[in-house]
Each structure stands twice: as C-alpha cells, then as structure tokens.
Amino acid sequence: QDLFFAAYLAVRQNQITGFPAQLHFMIDHILNALKNDSQLLIFVSKNLSWNVFQAALEQKMPDRDVRFYDKYLQLIEEGHQAYEHPDLLLFSVIELASSTCYNCILYQQPVPLEEYMPYLHKSIDGILSSYQKDSSDTSAD
C-alpha cells in the first residue's frame, strides 16, 4: 500500500496535471521503486493478487482518514474526463504493468524497463481510451 500512497503523493508534489499524465506518473513511480528494490519486486510478484491490491486500495492513507481509491477517483474527477468502471480501469492498468514489467526489471527481458516504458505508456493510453465515456454519456453519472 505504501507504493500507492507514495505514488499519489509524488503526483501532488510534482504538480502533475491531467489524469492520463498522473496515471502514467504513478505507474512509473511504482515501477521505479520496484526496480530499485528487487527483493520487494520478488515479494510483490509472488504475493500480490487483485485481492491484495484491492485491500491496499481500500486501506486508509497514513495520517489521513481517506482511502487511496478515493484519491484515485478524485484525480479522475479533477481531470474532467469520465471513465466507465474506474475500478476495472485501475485493475487493467495494474495487471498490465505488473505482468509485463517483472521480467523487464529483473532480467532486462525482452528489453530493459527503460526501453519498454514508452510501449507500456501507449498500452495504458489504449486502456484509458477504451474505458473513456462518450461526452454524450456524461449525464448518466
């Protein structure tokens, strides 16, 4: 859970604006933390399932009476863009990043993480696009 909180705080501290840029920044922040701590990466890869991610998202942020997931939803709202099923959107991005970056970080296979990142960002943009609500559909909120 600390990875999520640290990534969120880094977005705010660096004044990243726009939900897509914020999401990319948070994913990059988490992946860089995992890259710098291979033991944590191994632990995460062996012990994390969606249930563990969900539990981390539901826990309250340290020293605050708010959940990370609430802050995630706030970032979406501040970005003035609506997404269908923001929970599934986050699930898709987390699963994509965790499943594709493990070997890039630990073994530099098929390429090192730095080389893979632009492709990961394009894939995340595709996920964002596929979950984006039509502007005519915003009244259904």
Q: Language-model segments: which ranges?
A:
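Hydrophobic alpha-helical connector segments
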Residues: 2, 6-37, 93
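Amphipathic, well-ordered alpha-helical segments in soluble domains
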Residues: 3, 36, 40, 67-71, ...
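Amphipathic alpha-helical segments used for helix-helix packing
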Residues: 8, 21, 33-56, 70, ...
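A structural signal for alpha-helical segments
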Residues: 14-22, 52, 56, 60, ...
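Alpha-helical elements of Rossmann-like donor-binding domains used by nucleotide-donor carbohydrate transfer enzymes
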Residues: 25, 29, 71, 119-123
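Amphipathic alpha-helical packing segments from all-alpha helical-bundle domains
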Residues: 39, 53-80, 87-91, 125
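Hydrophobic/aromatic-rich alpha-helical bundle segments in the mid-to-C-terminal region
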Residues: 46, 76-124, 131-141
